[in-house]
Regions:
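Conserved nucleotide-cofactor-binding alpha/beta core module
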Residues: 47, 53-86, 90-93, 97
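Short, flexible loop segments at the rims of nucleotide/cofactor-binding pockets, characterized by
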Residues: 3-8, 32, 79-84, 119-120
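Short, basic, glycine/proline-bearing loop/turn elements
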Residues: 29-31, 71-80, 114-117
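Gly/Ser/Thr-rich loops at beta-strand to alpha-helix junctions
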Residues: 32-36, 111-112
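Membrane-anchoring hydrophobic helices of lipid-metabolizing enzymes
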Residues: 1-29, 39-41, 48-52, 68-69, ...
Length: 188
């Protein structure tokens, strides 16, 4: 519903969306070029096939009652109880997969950023937790690729200041409004 209100048209063909298995444990992995909109688009595409999905997302995004049931909070490393919260996240994720559900995640755990001032945005290495889920869950894995990257201003702001970068987050969401997007869904 939010995608429709934002005017974001998903141009992924039906035959690619059909690659999402309708039943059984599933992990959907994707690059993360844009931020919040990536997760919203993935949720919309998966929801066209099945509604038993949960998205691993930063804990600050989980306090919205309308979407909270679809979220599993990922703690920030600097949080006082990050280790305990991380274990809870892992347990909740594995329980959901054992129950035959879908987990949507961004393996790098953060939005793609440029390594230098002017280079292209690149994904960070997958975090250890992602490797463990993929290996130990026995779930089917479906890869998704989003083309594009955030604005150069955002990528430069990331080099200068966390506050400046965070201040531009809404601008980056606004750049996605009323535009088509064409994620590519790979074979399981």
């Amino acid at each position: 519903k939010a995608i429709r209100h934002m005017g974001i048209r998903i141009d992924t063909p039906a035959e690619e969306i059909a690659r999402i298995p309708a039943t059984g444990p599933l992990v959907v992995v994707s690059n993360h070029p844009s931020g919040l909109v990536d997760g919203m688009v993935l949720a919309e595409m998966v929801n066209r096939v099945r509604s038993d999905f949960r998205i691993l997302t930063r804990s600050l995004l989980t306090g919205i009652p309308e979407v909270e049931e679809f979220m599993i909070p990922v703690p920030f490393p600097h949080e006082d109880n990050a280790r305990e919260l991380g274990l809870q996240m892992r347990d909740e994720t594995m329980k959901h997969l054992r129950g035959g559900g879908v987990i949507i995640l961004f393996p790098a755990g953060k939005v793609a950023m440029s390594e230098g001032w002017w280079g292209p945005a690149v994904e960070a290495e997958w975090n250890v937790f992602t490797h463990k889920i993929v290996r130990s869950s026995g779930a089917t894995i479906v890869p998704v690729f989003f083309p594009g990257q955030n604005s150069r201003a955002f990528l430069i702001a990331n080099k200068l200041s966390d506050t400046l970068r965070q201040g531009l987050l809404l601008h980056e969401i606004k750049r996605c409004l009323f535009k088509p997007t064409r994620p590519v869904i790979g074979a399981p």
